[in-house]
């Protein structure tokens, strides 16, 4: 099928009056996938009891199977969550960390998950230690050396992003996981921006825990994410919300329902009270949508557009790039010589209808552009012309 920006843009529900260069924040869902999402909701509302108490679990299993094939792991090592923030907040209490333990991370982590770690560190007494990653980054070796510089014999876990949210860096996770195994340290990876963005092979990477969002670059409806847990670690997992899939009476309950999974891990997290799980069921259709439109070529085109846009903007501003080209995918964070970050974002959106993500960085405004299949060269040209007028 034709996968040019001109043909893909009408497939999305995005406001045509907005130059949308912020896919990375919350994603955007194609119309066929959104239609499927609503069809699952209609099935739920047509037969609420039959669907919610019986049929949905087979559909969830099928969805997890498709996701497992896509990221190369066992479907029963996956559970769905609305977002990685939710997944990390569920995971941390199950680690049973105490005042003798340390968790090593970076200063590049996503703020919401970072807050969860800080809260539980204060509550349980473990140390949450951040390796400072100086920018610009120059090499993988430099990053790894800086990251491991704060590891100690008390480091029990490493937690870091596969792709950083604010700075859009693709971190050398395979090397970090490999070194962590040598040091006998368990790994927790936040891959919120990974599924549908860069290849993910869980078995090859072999992390202990991995969470990712499907509503970003895989283009599912909002609120579809997963948590992978290595099988031998699943018995330690406990949900924050306890419901029918948990406890000694589970087998008795299972015998009288269609709850069929043999995985305790799956059951304790699937049953979390009444909720609409329709979005979770769209994962197979989202994968198929991208296959139909040869999304590998879309990603390649978008990556080239990101690098070209970054080159043009840094030539305009004279400010340094934050990383080499091969650290980037379909996003890039770029410095801009304007002090007031809030005013910068407001002017772009209110005056020029450009949606991007902004942040402050060492006295400069920084902004992150995201290029998805529906973005055209004209979108980038409009951004750069606007930036020229703001300097």
Ranges and model annotations:
Residues 1-391:
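Pyridoxal 5′-phosphate
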């Amino acid at each position: 099928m034709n996968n040019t920006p001109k043909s893909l843009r009408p497939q999305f529900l995005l406001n045509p009056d907005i130059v949308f260069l912020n896919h990375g924040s919350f994603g955007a869902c194609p119309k066929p996938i959104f239609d499927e999402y609503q069809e699952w909701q209609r099935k739920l509302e047509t037969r609420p009891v039959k669907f919610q108490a019986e049929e949905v679990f087979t559909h969830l299993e099928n969805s997890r199977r498709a996701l497992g094939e896509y990221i190369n792991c066992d479907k029963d090592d996956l559970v769905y969550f609305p977002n990685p923030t939710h997944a990390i907040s569920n995971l941390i209490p199950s680690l049973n960390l105490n005042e003798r333990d340390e968790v090593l991370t970076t200063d590049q982590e996503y703020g919401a998950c970072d807050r969860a770690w800080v809260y539980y560190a204060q509550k349980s007494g473990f140390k949450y230690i951040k390796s400072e990653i100086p920018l610009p980054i120059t090499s993988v070796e430099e990053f790894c050396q800086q990251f491991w510089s704060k590891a100690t014999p008390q480091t029990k876990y490493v937690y870091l992003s596969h792709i950083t949210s604010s700075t859009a860096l693709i971190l050398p996770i395979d090397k970090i996981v490999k070194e962590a195994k040598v040091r006998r340290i368990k790994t927790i990876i936040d891959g919120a921006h990974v599924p549908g963005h860069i290849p993910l092979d869980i078995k090859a990477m072999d992390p202990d825990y991995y969470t990712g969002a499907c509503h970003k670059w895989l283009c599912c409806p909002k609120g579809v994410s997963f948590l992978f847990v290595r099988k031998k670690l699943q018995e330690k997992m406990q949900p924050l919300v306890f419901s029918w899939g948990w406890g000694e009476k589970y087998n008795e309950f299972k015998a009288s329902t269609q709850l069929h999974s043999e995985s305790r891990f799956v059951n304790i997290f699937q049953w979390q009270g009444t909720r609409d799980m329709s979005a979770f069921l769209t994962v197979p259709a989202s994968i198929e949508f991208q296959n139909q439109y040869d999304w590998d070529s879309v990603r390649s085109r978008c990556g080239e557009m990101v690098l070209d846009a970054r080159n043009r903007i840094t030539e305009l501003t004279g400010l340094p790039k934050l990383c080499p080209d091969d650290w980037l995918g379909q996003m890039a964070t770029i410095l801009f010589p304007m002090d007031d970050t809030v005013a910068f974002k407001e002017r772009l959106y209110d005056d020029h209808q450009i949606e991007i993500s902004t942040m402050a960085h060492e006295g400069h405004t920084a902004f992150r552009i995201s290029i998805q299949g529906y973005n055209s060269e004209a979108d980038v040209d409009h951004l750069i012309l606007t930036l020229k007028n703001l300097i």
